[in-house]
Amino acid sequence: FEDWCTSDKLMEMNENFRVNVHRNLQRDSATKPLTENWSCTVVSGQEEGSLPGLFGLSFQQTSNSSSRHFQSPKKINLGPRHNCHNALMAVLAARELGVKFSESMERICEFDSPLPDRYGIEHIGKHVLINDTYNANPDSFASVINDLATNCSYPKNKLLIMGDMLELGQYSETEHAKILEQALRLDGLKAIFLKGEKFQNLIFSTQQKDHESQFDQVYALQETEDFPVALLSDLLDEESVILVKGSRKMNMEQFVDLLRNNLL
């Protein structure tokens, strides 16, 4: 699974991406390793009138003596695309425990949507809101920003409201800097709103480097009430995707309520 887990390839709408999984299984010390080759195709897309996040999964197993094919019976609403990797890992782990592919696929297809505030996607007027306010860490932040950068199911224009990631200890400044740099590289970026001293302390130091021209798009917020609602009509004059994310103690869900009340 190593190549699979470290792959940075992501799917684009109506295109496939293929991952080869090579497994060497040692069954008792007296037997030869059993090698099975797995190929998985993930198809992502958005049906007309629906929200982004619909996927199809297809497995192809090839061994020395046979070849078999399995696929999901219907589209799956997995939310962020990194959940495809999670789903594939779950399917293959279940197989090692004796669960049939057909049963695993049926169970995954029962998955409807993430839990509240965990990458919940909704339409607000003509815009797409991603409510990922339950919590945040460097991996989850990087994943969702990467999703915004590569998933053409979302509108081109992007607005980010980002709160600090807490409990990172000595790595806090480095990890916040990585996320801010990644966010500033997004195409179609309209603005970034930052809540919390960890992100805000980086603004000046980063401003002196590669993104000085972009910092007229970055705003520091002390409280939810500081959000410049009057700017929304200018920033979101076209169809946009809006991400709201931060650690639990940052109370980022308050921004979701603010957007719902002012964008309808």
Listing of model-derived features with the role each one plays in the protein:
Residues E2:
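Long, charge-dense, solvent-exposed interaction surfaces that engage phosphate-rich ligands
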Residues C5, K9-F17, S29-S39, Q46-P52, ...:
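ATP-dependent carboxylate-amine ligase
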Residues N20:
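Active-site "gating" loop of Rossmann-like NAD(P)-dependent oxidoreductase/epimerase domains
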Residues F55:
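A Rossmann-like FAD-binding core segment of flavoenzymes
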